[in-house]
Amino acid sequence: MKHYLGIDIGGTAVKLGIVDEAGRVLAKAEESVSFDGYRTPILTTVLKAAQAFLAAQSVPAESLAGIGVSATGQIDSRKGVVAGTCGNLPNYIGAPIKAELEKTFCLPVTVANDANCMTLGEVWVGGAQGYTDVIGVTLGTGVGGGILTGGRLLEGARGLGGELGHYRTHALDGVDCTCGAKGCWERYAATTALVRAAQEENPAWKDGRTIFAAAEAGDKTVLALLDAWTDEIAQGLAGMVHIFNPQLILIGGGVSAQQKLLIDPIAAKVKAAVMPAFAEGLEIRAAQLHNDAGMVGAVYYFRQTMEKE
């Protein structure tokens, strides 16, 4: 059975795993990429972490079939290079991820956007198995997205497609986004948008955990904030349903475990907002793979791209 190195590069940490051809994670580790305030370039940290991980697992690089990388940012998947970001990640734009990993390990490498990989991981061994038309959305610091249409990942001309967070839902009167535009969906639908609104009401509501705990306790202010937040998420998703006509929408990110307070309201609101024919058969639920989705999806992207299965 073939084995692969899956790498998931985030803004604060890199996750690494040995993944087999059935999508099982056999071993994994995680290292900070921000440990020194990014004075060490992220790619340098990733290369060292990958070497240390394989050594710790006693896995020689030559025993692997290849390396699949999931990476935050706008990823030119054709070249395996970081084409852009919307945050402050020093020395990251232009990072030649594919070339440096191939040089270091003498293995074939593919690189794709992290939200695209999350969606592919779910299609391979998660909650989207057997589906051909899927929208995957991750809610966190921003909003990531991956789109599967007709069984194929929608990547666009350079592999940059699927930047759902920068779909402009408030283009005329919206707040400034880190990308330089106004009114991007993620400024209203990201978990950080909920936290910003909650902090204005009560400084103790500092993260998703404290906010949802207050909601579980029946706090009316928090429940109103959640209602407004899920409205924003649902309105963005409704527009995408009309464009892509998916069978399934998967919602990922740490908050996606909140079935009653998040997933159920979003599902009801999306179905109420779209035309009846689009709501028929539409499923909306939480993603299943959680923290492993990126590395698993990265390996699936590698297999689809390099092995043409």
What are the language-model segments listed below?
Residues 80-93:
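A charged helix-plus-loop insertion that forms the helical arch/lid used to bind
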Residues 92-100, 165, 169:
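Short, acidic/small-residue loops that bind anionic groups at enzyme active sites
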